[in-house]
């Protein structure tokens, strides 16, 4: 709501600001709160938390894509270490609700409460986005799969059936979150309603209301409020499409407190052609214009990006390893600074950590990996993009004046080079300015040198004044500051980028950085002398004393150098590589801590935390190898502990402690061997009895789905039979006749990259192998390769995999058989249809891993993939064999148990590699093919969908907690051969990295790996 408070964007800057006063914006912007609390406020400039302005820099991760609660701390510590002030999560209604009326917020990773307590403990604000629809390339966009039958109406509108279905989840999750709101002493600052739902108007120009959409949004808001949510409500419009839910545009039903915009300027998928209709022709590094849109959409609210591109998902058939080429460190450098140039003051990267689509969590668009080319990779490694993002997030955290700026210009007129554009941002209260420089044509990758005209408190200047020109080298942007406060000091200007600062023993330590080999220049006010404390790694050094300032010009080679000013202020000069491993680590858990109560550490791969106990400085973090470390800390520090061990200090001169940490940590995996194998498709045998609890007889004659099936059979859609994910098995019978059928026509829908195979009386009659984009297939299969029975029923078996439910309105698209028709000289009908479900159907026998982990294969139903299963029916696989093979068409399960013993103090990242015959892997000695589908299970978790005929993913990271790092690990692989020529795969595992770490990777994760239970036998 609008309230009477206002913030004046004033002119009180002083006459010394040449040419600035005339440009200042004197608009009086209203200061808003939601009428329930003023703990979180906002205006045209930024969010205010407890009265203090914040530049909110956040990033997203999904707890349900890393189902190990102990590792959530690992991720949050890495997010905190980089300088992010916040993080964001989606909740997942479908993950928490296996059946109507049932909610699970307790078992394993379903209990996400620890994320909110960790946010408080570690010191990060939290943006929570509970849906009920989240998209997220999740199965059905995060809706429970039991809602996809059509029985609940259109979904995502005010249909009473849908509202009744969602209310238990929505009310309960609001109650769970409420105690952790910032208004109740927690760190949750914003609560999102729905997701990318630009459905407020039937006609935006006339504001003809979309009543169903408005009432739906209002209902969600009301229920959240009724259940304790008093934080500001937000929403994220997609891709500058639409003008919904903004209080600045209307007083219509359903408006939220703060509206934001999601944008993926490169493309949200590696297949960039999918984004052409939204972003236009794909041009690498071409930025988009948000400034004008925000002025139109939300002029009295902060320019807010609840999702900005942190990477892209890799679709079926996409490149092995993802699409990082145009989404790497250069992307982070250019695009995130470009947002700042457009006055965006609240950013959340999607994704900061992507994780894994284990089980059947993925939508039809993606395979197992959800790495997303994120700054933190799927295996939790910090990649170069993380460090390149970190040098900006460290800056925005301490650049307090950046949270209130007007954009006074944006053109090439500031620059001496017409190829370089500059946006001038200025704080109307302090006069601090930020000049964001980039190529005028952002896709340009040229090297450009230039000077910049700036206005400062000491007049108009062209900078640098003495040194070499500023350089933009390729796809790069730089933020040049003027009148920048750090502690009690002021930078008149700096052409080197500010990284961070700290006030230690009452003296400022400022870190500046330039790319290796480039020049920088800075002027500090209030002091007129400087000296280089370390000249060993710089060149072309010039010091220019002034009457009341000192200017230093430098060219930075690799590493770190130190300049000391006459009053004891220290300036740390860094090249890019050194800046990447220069950490600003607070001594407290205040998310807003900026410069005080901070130590600076250079060298480690990661610094997680710092604590000063008496004169003991205790640091925790990770080391890749032997590393020389420099620590800027109070002079009172008498000892340094790293990960609980006292270090040997080499030097402690001038308040800089140097030491060497770590060694060359190593770990070798045991060989995976001892495989045993069994049939996992007994259902094709004529003597198989489909009478166990796994089977349901299809008797329903009318479908609730908006896409009705053919009327010649009962409803064969899996969801209407309480079966939702994975592989599905149909078993149909039809009688023998004198003029038997010759073919069967099948029309099956399974989503992108799905497939199916068909058997008649145990004889294989064909497969649809699928494609990366085909969601439905109809095909006629001949019976010429099968033997029809002359005196008893014939048995037709269809095995399909349901790749997932579609997103948005497509969630209602059916899964399963739409039409099955016998063809021949006579008239035929099936006697009976049965479907095999997962063990327990919607009453899952394994609530820890449920409800998206298991399908209906025999091996899954009886629990061969689970720890503790006695594999008595198995056959030994030859110890000389490096391959798992299936002769002919069929499905087999392979299983082994391998122990691990990872020493305490190591973070060992492990990935499985699955390969099949191809021209780039290996040639099968027996002529087996890659026409197969395999599922990788690790201690009961399905952690890999391997479809070599379609997809290119071969590496499958599996985290500790799923893997038992100090015990036996049950590894199972189901191999579905879809060809008469048989199939072959090789399974191995590799160490991705080994780090010495403070993080306890030997936590007790046994509760996450429940074993086999006897009840499984009832689903054979």
UniProtKB/Swiss-Prot annotation:
Catalytic activity: Hydrolysis of terminal non-reducing beta-D-galactose residues in beta-D-galactosides
Glycosylated residues in this chain: 25, 111, 172, 210, 251, 271, 410, 455, 549, 596, 625, 702, 747, 785, 819, 880, 919
GO terms (BP aspect): polysaccharide catabolic process
Localization: Secreted
GO MF term set: beta-galactosidase activity
Secretion signal span: 1-22
Annotated EC: 3.2.1.23
Active site per the UniProt annotation: 196, 307
Disulfide topology: 270-323
Keywords: Carbohydrate metabolism, Disulfide bond, Glycoprotein, Glycosidase, Hydrolase, Polysaccharide degradation, Secreted, Signal
UniProt: substrate binding residues: 90, 135-137, 195, 264, 372
Domain of life of the source: Eukaryota
Keyword Disulfide bond: yes
GO cellular component terms listed in the entry, alphabetical order: extracellular region
Function: Cleaves beta-linked terminal galactosyl residues from gangliosides, glycoproteins, and glycosaminoglycans.
Membership in a protein family: Belongs to the glycosyl hydrolase 35 family.
Name of the protein described by the UniProt record: Probable beta-galactosidase B
């Amino acid at each position: 709501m609008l309230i009477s408070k206002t913030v004046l964007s004033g002119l009180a800057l002083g006459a010394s600001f040449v040419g600035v006063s005339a440009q200042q914006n004197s608009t009086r912007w209203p200061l808003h709160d939601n009428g329930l609390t003023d703990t979180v406020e906002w205006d045209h400039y930024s969010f205010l938390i407890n009265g203090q302005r914040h530049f909110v820099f956040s990033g997203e991760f999904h707890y349900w894509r890393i189902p190990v609660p102990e590792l959530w701390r690992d991720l949050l510590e890495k997010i905190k270490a980089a300088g992010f002030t916040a993080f964001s999560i989606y909740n997942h209604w479908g993950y928490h609700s296996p059946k109507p009326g049932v909610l699970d917020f307790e078992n394993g990773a379903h209990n996400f409460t620890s994320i909110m307590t960790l946010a408080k403990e570690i010191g990060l604000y939290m943006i929570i986005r509970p849906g009920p629809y989240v998209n997220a390339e999740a199965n059905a966009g995060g809706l429970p799969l039991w809602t996809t039958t059509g029985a609940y109406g259109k979904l995502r509108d005010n249909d009473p059936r849908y509202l009744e279905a969602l209310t238990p989840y929505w009310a309960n999750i609001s109650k769970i979150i409420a105690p952790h709101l910032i208004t109740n002493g927690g760190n949750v600052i914003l609560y999102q309603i729905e997701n990318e739902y630009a459905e407020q108007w039937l006609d935006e120009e006339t504001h003809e209301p979309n009543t169903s959409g408005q009432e739906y949004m209002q209902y969600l808001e009301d229920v959240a409020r009724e259940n304790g949510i008093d934080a500001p409500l937000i929403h994220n419009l997609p891709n500058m499409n639409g003008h919904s839910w903004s209080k600045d545009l209307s007083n219509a039903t359903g408006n939220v407190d703060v509206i934001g915009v999601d944008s993926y300027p490169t493309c949200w998928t590696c297949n960039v052609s999918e984004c052409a209709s939204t972003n236009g022709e794909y041009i690498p590094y071409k930025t988009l214009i948000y400034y004008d849109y925000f002025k139109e959409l939300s002029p009295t609210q902060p320019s807010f990006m609840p999702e900005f591109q942190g990477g892209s998902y890799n679709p079926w058939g996409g490149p092995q390893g993802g699409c990082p080429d145009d989404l790497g460190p250069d992307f982070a450098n250019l695009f995130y600074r470009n947002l700042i140039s457009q006055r965006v003051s609240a950013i959340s990267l999607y994704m900061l950590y992507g994780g894994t689509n284990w089980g059947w969590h993925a939508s039809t668009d993606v395979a197992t990996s959800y790495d997303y080319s994120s700054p933190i990779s799927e295996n939790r490694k910090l990649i170069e993009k993380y460090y390149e993002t970190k040098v900006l997030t460290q800056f925005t955290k301490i650049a307090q004046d950046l949270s209130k700026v007007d954009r006074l210009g944006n053109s090439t007129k500031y620059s001496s080079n017409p190829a370089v554009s500059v946006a001038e941002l200025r704080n109307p209260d302090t006069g601090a300015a930020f000049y964001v420089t980039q190529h005028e044509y952002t896709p340009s990758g040229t090297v450009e040198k230039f000077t910049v005209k700036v206005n400062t408190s000491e007049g108009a200047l062209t900078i640098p004044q003495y040194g070499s020109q500023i350089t933009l080298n390729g796809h790069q942007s730089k933020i040049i500051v003027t009148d920048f406060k750090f502690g009690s000091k002021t930078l008149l200007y700096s052409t080197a980028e500010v990284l961070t600062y700290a006030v230690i023993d009452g003296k400022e330590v400022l870190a500046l950085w330039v790319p290796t080999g480039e020049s920088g220049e800075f002027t500090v006010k209030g002091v007129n002398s400087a000296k280089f404390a370390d000249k060993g790694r710089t060149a072309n050094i010039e010091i220019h004393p002034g009457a009341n300032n000192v200017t230093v010009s430098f060219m930075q080679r690799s590493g770190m150098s130190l300049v000391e000013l006459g009053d004891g202020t220290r300036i740390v000069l860094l090249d890019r590589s050194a800046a990447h491993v220069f950490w600003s680590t607070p001594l407290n858990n205040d998310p807003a801590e900026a410069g005080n109560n901070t130590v600076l550490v250079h060298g480690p791969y990661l610094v997680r935390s710092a604590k000063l106990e008496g004169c003991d400085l205790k640091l925790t973090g990770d080391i890749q190898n032997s590393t020389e470390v420099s620590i800027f800390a109070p002079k009172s520090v008498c000892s340094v502990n790293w990960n609980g061990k006292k270090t040997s200090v080499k030097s402690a001169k001038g308040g800089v402690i140097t030491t060497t940490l770590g060694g060359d940590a190593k770990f070798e995996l045991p060989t995976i061997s001892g495989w045993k194998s069994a049939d996992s498709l007994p259902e094709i045998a004529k003597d198989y009895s489909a009478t166990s609890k796994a089977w349901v007889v299809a008797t329903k004659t009318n479908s609730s789905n908006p896409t009705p099936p053919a009327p010649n059979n009962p409803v064969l859609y899996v969801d209407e039979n309480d079966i939702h994910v994975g592989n599905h098995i149909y078993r149909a019978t039809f009688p023998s006749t004198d003029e038997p059928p010759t073919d069967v026509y099948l029309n099956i829908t399974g989503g992108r990259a799905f497939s199916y195979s068909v058997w008649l009386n145990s004889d294989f009659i064909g497969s649809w192998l699928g494609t990366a984009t085909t969601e439905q297939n109809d095909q006629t299969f001949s019976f010429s390769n099968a033997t029809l029975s002359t005196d008893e029923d014939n048995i037709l078996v269809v095995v399909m995999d349901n790749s997932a439910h579609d997103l948005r309105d497509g969630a209602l698209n059916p899964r399963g058989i739409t039409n099955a028709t016998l063809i021949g000289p006579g008239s035929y009908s099936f006697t009976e249809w049965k479907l095999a479900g997962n063990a327990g159907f919607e009453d899952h026998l394994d609530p820890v891993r449920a409800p998206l982990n298991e399908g209906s294969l025999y091996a899954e139903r009886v629990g061969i993939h689970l720890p503790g299963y006695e594999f008595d029916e198995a056959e030994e696989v030859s110890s000389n064999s490096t391959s798992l093979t299936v002769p002919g068409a069929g499905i087999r399960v392979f299983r082994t148990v391998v122990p691990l013993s990872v020493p305490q103090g190591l973070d060992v990242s492990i990935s499985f590699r699955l390969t099949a015959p191809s021209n780039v892997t290996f040639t099968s000695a027996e002529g087996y093919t890659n026409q197969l589908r395999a599922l990788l299970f690790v201690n009961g978790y399905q952690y890999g969908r391997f479809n070599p005929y379609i997809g290119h993913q071969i590496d499958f990271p599996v985290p500790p907690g799923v893997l038992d790092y100090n015990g036996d690990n049950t590894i199972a692989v189901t191999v579905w051969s879809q060809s008469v020529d048989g199939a072959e795969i090789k399974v191995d595992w590799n160490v991705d990295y080994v780090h010495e770490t403070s993080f306890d990777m030997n936590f007790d994760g046994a509760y996450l790996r429940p074993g086999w239970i006897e009840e499984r036998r009832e689903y054979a």
